[in-house]
Amino acid sequence: MATKKWLLLMVVTVMVAPLLTACGAEPTPTPEPAVAQPTQVPEPEPTAAPEPVTIEWWTVSSEEYTEEVQRAMAQEFEASHPNIKVNVTVLPSSGFGEKMTTALGAGEGAPDVAFFWDNNWFPEALELTPYIEADPDFSPDLYFPGFWNTRAMWGDKVVGLPLGVGANFVMYNKDVFDEAGVAYPTDDWTTEDYIDIATQLTDPEQKRWGGDRPRGPFRAIFFNYGARPYADDSSTVEGYLNSEETLAAYTWLWDLVDSGSTPTPAELEVLGTEGTGPVDLFLSGRLGMATLNQGHMLNAKEANASFGIVPEPGVEGQTRYMHGWSLTCSIWKGTEHPQEAWEFLSYWVGPEGQKYLMDNGNLFPSIPSVLDTYADADKDYVQAFFRVLAQDQDAEWLMGHPCYRGGVQRAIQDLWDKIMFGDIAREDIPAEMESLMGPAQDALEECVPRLGG
C-alpha cells in the first residue's frame, strides 16, 4: 500500500516539474509603451433652423392677376426664400380702400406689404431708398421712367414700386373703316382728324357712331393742346384755366359733341342698362373708334375682332401725351420686418414677380426688359400699345399737383357738363370759363395748405 502511494507521488512530481521549469525560464517581459489614443471631439449638436418670419400681404383679385395666380406666385417666392412666409389676404376691391384707411389711421393692424393706390396713404409708407441702395440686384432704372416718377416717387421720397402699366388709346374697328371706305388713322393724327373721321364713319340708319368722347378735362387731349388748369407752382389759375390753349381744348370738345358723331350721355346711360358699354358697341361694329385700354385690347383679341390701335389724337406743334397708370405697392412704415418685407416687395414688383404675373395672368409689366418678352410682343397691335407707353404722361403733372383733383376739378365741372349735354353755345365758352375763375382760385387756395402744391 505504501509502495503505491510512493509511486503516485513520483508520477505527479515528474509531470509538474517541467511546467514549473518552463514558467520560471522566461524573463519578465519589458512592458510596451502605451500608445496615445486620439482625443475624441464630441460631435456638435445640430442647430435648429430659425423659424421663418411671417409677413402679411393684402391684395385684390383682378383680370390681370387672379387670386389663384397671386397665391402661386407667393409660393414661388417662399420656395426661394425659406426664411420668409407670406400670409396672403385677398380682399374685395370694393372694401380694400376702407380697410386700408382704417388700419393705417389706427396705426396698427396694417399689412406689411400692400397696394397703396390712394395718395392719402403715402405718409404711412416706408421710405425705400435705404433698401434700394443696399440691394445690388435692384435699380429704379429697371422701370419705365414715367411710371417710376408718378407711382414710386412722392416728393423726394420713394414710397413704393409701380406694378404693371395701363394706358388709354384709341382702338379702331377695321371692318367699320373698310365698309365706310375710310383710311385708318395713324400715330400722328390730330384732334381735327378725329372729328373728321368720326363724322365719316357715323351712320344713323345703322345706329352707328364714329367715335366717343374724352373721359374728362385735363387729361391727354387737353394736355396735347398745351392746357393746364393752374400754374406749376400752384399759385394761380389766372392765365392757365382761361388761356388760349385751354379754351381751344374746350372748343374742340364742343365741336366734337356738335358733330353728332358720338353717343350722348343719355344714350350711353340707356345702353348701359342693357348691358352694352363702349367696348360692346365697339366689338359689335356700332362704334367705329373708342377710347379704351389694354384690357379691352385683350378682349378684342379674344373675340377675334379686326382692330388697330393709335395714340389719342394730338395737336400740331405741341408735345403729345398719354393718360397712363400703374399701381403703387408699398411697405407699411409700422412693419416689424422691414428687410423681409422689402425682399418680398422687390420680388413681387420686380422682374421675377411681374414676369410670373404676365406669363400666368394678364399683367403688362412696368419693366421694359420684362415687357419685351410678352408672348405677342411682335404683333402690330401690341407694338402700337408699346409706342403709347413711351409717350409723356399727363400723370407726371397731375400727380405732382394734387389740388386739381383735390378741389379745382369740382369747381370747373359745370363747363364740362354744359358742353357734354349741349347746354351752351360755342361763343359762350369764354364767358362761362371766366365765371368759374373765382371758384377755381378759391378751391386752389383752400387745397394747397391741405395737400401741397
Regions found by a protein language model. Give the residues of each.
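Short helix-initiation/N-cap motifs at beta->coil->alpha
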Residues: V90-K99, W189-I195, A266-D280, W325
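Glycine-centered hinge/linker elements that transmit conformational signals in sensory
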Residues: A198, S235-L271, K301-A303, E312
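Hinge/lid segment of periplasmic solute-binding proteins
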Residues: F115-A167, G308-V310, D376-D380
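Short helices/loops that flank or line small-molecule/ion binding pockets
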Residues: G97-G109, V176-F177, I195-P204, E274-R286, ...
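Periplasmic solute-binding protein
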Residues: F122-T129, W148-Y184, R213-S235, D258, ...
